[in-house]
From Swiss-Prot:
Name under which the protein is recorded: Maltose/maltodextrin-binding periplasmic protein
One Pfam family from the record: SBP_bac_1
InterPro entries referenced in this protein's UniProt entry, alphabetically: Maltose/Cyclodextrin-bd, SBP, SBP_1_CS
Signal peptide positions on this chain: 1-26
Locations listed in the record: Periplasm
Amino acid sequence: MKIKTGVGILALSALTTMMISAPALAKIEEGKLVIWINGDKGYNGLAEVGKKFEQDTGIKVTVEHPDKLEEKFPQVAATGDGPDIIFWAHDRFGGYAQSGLLAEVTPDKAFQDKLYPFTWDAVRYNGKLIAYPIAVEALSLIYNKDLVPNPPKTWEEIPALDKELKVKGKSAIMFNLQEPYFTWPLIAADGGYAFKFENGKYDVKDVGVDNAGAKAGLTFLIDMIKNKNMSADTDYSIAEAAFNKGETAMTINGPWAWSNIDKSKVNYGVTLLPTFKGKPSKPFVGVLSAGINAASPNKELAKEFLENYLLTDQGLEAVNKDKPLGAVALKSFQEQLAKDPRIAATMDNAQKGEIMPNIPQMSAFWYAVRTAVINAASGRQTVDAALKDAQSRITK
């Protein structure tokens, strides 16, 4: 990744990562804004919003997209440097806030009401708001309209559909069974949850991985494997290839998968995930968020930029035109984007989902649930034993 700076183009090397406040990246200073955003996001569109801000206020805005910015930010912010504003998925922000690297943000009620309420929950840490929500990502059911014009509304219908499709040499559904991010929506549907969230805080001792609902969801998944409706070794690339070649009728994936499906010319739709036992599947929801560096001398300018320039229809449109944001937190712009049924479905699934907890204990959750699903799918452990082990690993 190359980063444009005032002194030409410097490739970030091992050396410059050691001295990150070297000329490779703009230093924090009063009277200008430096923003970091990942290279896969619409940074040129964000720079356009910055130009408008500069025209109106005279304050220069520099947008940078350093490699591994989520790792660099805590290193430089701890020394009182880095960007004024950082964009990243909300689940990393809890750790930053715990280390005192993010300023509390204080949007008034009128501004908060412009955004979907659940998106604010994603940027709350210990009861305080630590960032502004920008865009929303969640898994959806993606289906091949030529194979299933009317996709099933329930998980319980899928085995029979698979039987019908097998006669034609196809299968009903394939999705990544190796990562709990993809299997969790079914496990959580009937009452499983990661950590209990109450009063703006997560209770790390209240974990819902081996309750009756989680067991029911995982048992259904394992039964589908035992009955050969799915294969235990299916991973992301196997599932993606099968769907994009028209070999399977449905998959579970997010907005990042759409461009490859577009290229494959499959006639597809995006819709609500199926219900299980009459209850919605609960995907983890990721929220692209913008936090303000606690060391920034420009906190009021950062707030002005985020509230009155970026989080407006015009601001988000500029970023979205550069690289699609998917569903967005701002109600007025989401209403425009929702004319695309894929984006409407993403938001529907997100609103039924579970905000990805922004606490460090999630790394133990991912590891433990991944092991549990793989062990249960391969027959190494029963569902009950696998989830019991996962629960104790997460809470120990």
